[in-house]
Amino acid sequence: SRDHDFGPSFCMWLTKEDYQVIGPELRRAYQALPKDFYGYPPRKEEPFGGERVGVLCIDDFYRRQIGRADAEFSMTGWVYVPESRLATVTNGEVFVDKLGQFSAIREKLLAFYPNDVRLKKMAARAAVMGQAGQYNYARCMRRGETVAAQHALSEFILNTISMVFLLNKRYKPYYKWMHRAMLTLPVLGEEVGGLIKELAENGVNLDAWDCE
């Protein structure tokens, strides 16, 4: 996003041992690099934008993002790890990784949820889609309860987007980028994305409902 923390930067991940030995020196070298690059102005960092770029420790990065440094989750762990964090650590591109330690963890995560976890999540999303979208949204609109209808519609949209990501075996990103990212998915992404956009723009229009 260009709204914040955007500008020339990159990440260099080191093992814990290398980070302790050469981390400080590499951090100084990174800070000494030109702040602008090919016409892009210097990165404007928000107060909480630190430790996102530069020289980082592999273990600390994964532990901060997903709670573990090895990605060896139990079935319960897979259920509760924040999905947007899984999206964060699997998006983007790794340019060079001759050691392979960083990419090995990333590849485990890119393999996606264990199938039992994926099916459980899909069943949960379908249940909410049915109750919030097919049932309660229509009931609220017929009664003219637009605030309650908007809540139901939001639940339906969130769970529908999540379902499409699960069908594509891709992690759903932070809510600001969910819809835009869904449009790029090969299975139902563009089709469902268009319907959701139309629903979001017209979903609480009382003129379209018989509220008697």
Question: Where is each model-derived feature located?
Answer:
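Ligand-binding pocket scaffold of soluble enzyme catalytic domains
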Residues: 9, 40, 145
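Active-site nucleotide-donor binding segment shared across nucleotidyl transfer reactions
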Residues: 1-17
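A generic structural motif
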Residues: 14-19, 143-147
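Conserved nucleotidyltransferase catalytic core and NTase-mimicking acidic/glycine-rich helix/loop elements
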Residues: 87-212
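Generic detection of long, well-ordered alpha-helical segments
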Residues: 16-23, 206-211
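Conserved NTP/Mg2+-binding pocket subregion across the NTase superfamily
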Residues: 19-142
